[in-house]
Amino acid sequence: MSLGLFSRAQIAQVNAIAEKSKASLEQSAPKTARSTKGLNAELKAMSDAVIEYFKDSKAILITSKEQLHDYVTNLIDSGYGSLDTETTGLDRIRDTIVGVSLYYPGGVECYIPSKHLVPIFDAPYKDQLTYEEIGEELQRIADSSVKLIFANADFDLSMIYKDLKVDLIKNCYYDVILAWRCLKENERNNRLKELYNKYVLKGKGDPKTFSDFFPPKLFPYCKPEVAKLYAANDAKITYELFTWQLPYVMKDNPKCKKNHLEAISDLIWGVEFPLMGVCQKMHRDGIYIEPSMAEMLNRKYLPIADAELKKLQGMVQEILDNPKYTTRVKRPFLRATDFNPESTPHVAWLCYDLMKLDSGKGGRSTGKEILGTFNAPVAKQILKCRSLGVLISTFVKKLPNAVGPDGKIHCTFKQIGADTGRFSSADPNMQNIPSKAGDIRRMFRAMPGHVLMSSDYSQQEPKLTAYVSQDEKMVQAFKDNKDIYSIIASIAFGVPYEDCLEFKPTGKFDEDGNPIKVYNASGKARRGEAKTIVLGITYGRSVVTIADQLYAHEPWSDEEKIKKAQHVFDSVLNAFPSLRKLMINAQNCAKTNGYVETILGRRRHIPDMQLPEFEFKPMKGYVNPDIDPLDVSTLDNQESIPQRVVDRLYKELTSYKYFGQVAKRIRELAENDHIKVINNRFKIQEASRKCVNSIIQGSAAEQTKLAMLLIDNDPEWNALGGHVILPVHDELIAEVPIENWEACANRLSKLMCDAASFLPFASKCDVTVSYRWNGMEYPCKYPEPNSLDNLTEDEVMWVQYHLFECGYELPVFKTPDGDKPEGDAALGVNGVVTDQYNSYIRDYCNRYNITEDEFIYHIHTKVHTGSAPVKQLGDYKQISSKS
């Protein structure tokens, strides 16, 4: 571009910052180095492509406040409009808005540029509006009753709120992407351009996405008059896709009725769309995290991971040295110490080529679901190493990088993160933080003056299974407040209920009138078997997986484990025929309709249920036996397989009992008859297991979502200052003022139970309160010490707990018998009392000239309340400056 567009002062300013600007551009551009000439050529090619593609566009570029004011006035008058943002990237915290697009019916789409930059110099283009100017006009929309249409509203609402300081939640009327996830959740190409081309243009267009035009990070350097062509079009086609979708989601519309989408309509308008505002609030609120705790966890887990990797490599070396394992396939690693458990070629070679392990599915999968079924210690060790690797790389190392300027992590919440309708989150995925890794979860804490409150449904999915299956025995067990798994074990195995409890009543009572119970190992085993079967049905697990879960540590062969698991599985289903009926009905529904439905009518499409077990296709060289070379009329069918042949082969293959027989016959047909056989049995088996799981898991997700809506709209909860900040499957995490924790706990539990009022038995929620997620419960049950002399065990626990809650890594001592403490104790919480520990505290006070009274005062007034900053306490290592 010509420098004549700038004044001398502007040119001088640009020259002064040129080097800095070039460095900035290099950082924002792809890693491959670009010369100025090369960059300009790339930008020109980009612009030419956009101009050519949108040559018929009528989009307008808004470059003045007056022009924007008039456009917004027309949009408000129309009552409807669509909005889209263009940004520097997808990071909602660190990326920024470059421009905003608007459209209203009967008008012309527009683009409002704000942060487009001149290449090389990073100087802003002329005639752009500031964030404040755009925000002022968008606030007029926020103050009106305009109904806005979005494509991925969650992202646009977040960016507008962060950069433009405008809250458009109440104007958010419709999201074309979210609606389509409800209508057809299994369609993978569900981006705006693909949906618009497929359904509005009937597949006749040429859909090009953002990445087809703009190389990474270069959109801000696109000229505004070029950018408008692409950006404004997004707003326009969003609205047009909305008008196409609308008849299918309006209950009174013939298209909705014809496709039996009335329940989906209720789900969209009554649950998913109202929940968009709740997700926005959770994203904005965020959750505090102490990144420096990651240092401690890194020191803890790295040595463990290294030790487990060395153990694995030692096992690999033993296998390599074992003469019974041989293969002609070249080894993909040089030495055992080079073996990488994350490498698919390494693991596949070891398991399949060398050890000849059989997945039972004919493939070479190295995923968790397959390796977990192998009765081989090395496979279990591979999974253990992978689990530790994920723990360190995904959580310990990455979580601190996700912290925003306010010290919080602001997740992106996906309302339909799974095809079942379950929530998920990203940046980071909080649902993937393992519950067993309590110390990872303890990185998250409440803000000062607040506590975290966790409330989860007690046996949510078993209760929904009882409700959906209408099993009278299960329903009655819940009505009688009996342990459901012990009841199932009792009926299935013909054993008294008390003998299926983990802790069996003795018939005696203590001084307070409580029943005295004794540990019952056989009862625990029976209950565990019943629980594994019921959850296996719910989660769609195969008998092979169930066998591994139940009998992994038994010295039996794989065949014996599977046989035993099948026996237990059949015993439970025979005792509870309604469960078997649920499985059969769900599978039949999927076969007939191609989908199953939840209690609210959400559909989970499972097309593989409608596949034939075997498909037959002619290969090169196939000759139709019905062809008469002298009859010209038969020649058109010479490459087709006659139906009678298909029927005969289908009957033959379905008669085989074992996989090996089927595989052998398929090879013979290919080699001798030139008929390719597609075996769909595995796909159908996998699909069959999804049927019940989709109903139960999807219904559980809906129950949790209904609870979130009740909580968000509850005046009493809001008056108490509580707010939900995180959903994790059947659990909701809330942050509440410390002074209202009891009232909030009662209210949260009631509202969640109210969301399950459709059940024929009482619902129950387990509520815990703590400073940290997965921390010790608040209020602390330990006494406050009055002296540091001769501390009791409870008092040491109390001191350790509160110091840990305020971010101190405490010394850990072995128990009197020499054992190192585990769990919380290993972190200095629930610490062990020893003379060494007592003397440590006294020596600490003497060394730093702190009286015992001062120490106690600090514990009482600073640490206990959590409302004041923690001052440095000598050689206690402070791992966070936040309390």
Regions found by a protein language model. Give the residues of each.
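Conserved "right-hand" nucleotidyltransferase catalytic core of DNA-directed polymerases
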Residues: 2-124, 169-171, 187, 195-200, ...
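Acidic beta-strand-to-loop metal/phosphate-binding motif
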Residues: 82, 145-153, 452-454
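Short active-site loop/helix that positions an aromatic residue
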Residues: 90-91, 100, 154-166, 179-183, ...
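Structural signature of nuclease core domains in nucleic-acid processing machines
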Residues: 94-146, 157-161, 166-171, 735-737, ...
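Conserved beta-strand -> loop -> alpha-helix junction used to position metal-binding or nucleic-acid-contacting
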Residues: 166-185, 192-193, 481-485
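Conserved pre-motif C helix in the palm subdomain of viral-like polymerases
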Residues: 233-240, 689-712
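C-terminal structured "cap/appendage" subdomains that terminate the fold
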Residues: 711-769
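Cell-envelope/ECM-targeting effectors and their regulatory/trafficking segments
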Residues: 784-883
